[in-house]
Amino acid sequence: SGQENPKQNDSLEVFRITKYDKNWNKIKSCGLYGANTTVPFDAGSARMTHSGDHLLVRTCHEMYKSSDGNNHQANVTIEVDMPSMTITDSYTGIMNVDYGYVSHSFNQFIKTDGNHIVALDHGDAHPRSAVLVKYNSDFTTGKFFPSYFEQVSNIDVVTYPEYTAGHYNYTGAAIGG
């Protein structure tokens, strides 16, 4: 679940992941605070996968106001240790696709390949493509993105043509699965 954060408060919980038993009794939850997020789940989807004790979430958010005065949208990745229900890693910052960042990301998918995260995002600008991203680090360590120096592998599966009639949002494409 999520909570809007229009005042850009770094101590406000904006994403909450809750664990339930098979009878829908709440067991435990964990949260992500601030996280460069004003509107969680904005203009995209929320998908999850798990492997062993690790829950991996790929979703999106509207971010804190940037230097151009706008609140841009991008993807979000969160890793949770399920037995302890603690967030072990997350990425909500601004970077480029070499770090798994896609903006705007209108649809997000996540799977695992062995001990690596594989994700697909529908980007309209950075990059303007359906981009497949593979994280090169071993997420079972609790860190899918351990350092600034460890980039991801990425490939544009489909590149969308330039759109000059206004904002980049229109791509003429839909990704399903």
List each language-model region with its residue ranges.
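Beta-propeller fold detector
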Residues: I27-G34, I87-M95, T141-T159
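Short glycine-/Asp-/Thr-/Trp-enriched loop segments that recur within the blades
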Residues: G34-S45, N96-S105, V152-A174
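Short glycine/acidic-enriched loop and turn motifs that connect beta-strands
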Residues: Q3-N9, E62-D68, G123-R128
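Residue-level recognition of a conserved intra-blade site in WD40 beta-propeller repeats
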Residues: M48-H50, F109-T112
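Entry beta-strands of beta-propeller and related beta-repeat scaffolds
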Residues: S1, D53-R58, G114-A119, G177
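Asp-box/WD-like beta-propeller blade repeats and closely related beta-sheet repeat scaffolds
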Residues: S11-R16, K26-S51, C60-S66, H72
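Beta-propeller blade signature
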Residues: L12-W24, N70-T86, A130-D138
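Extended alpha-helical scaffolding regions
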Residues: N70, E79, D89-S105
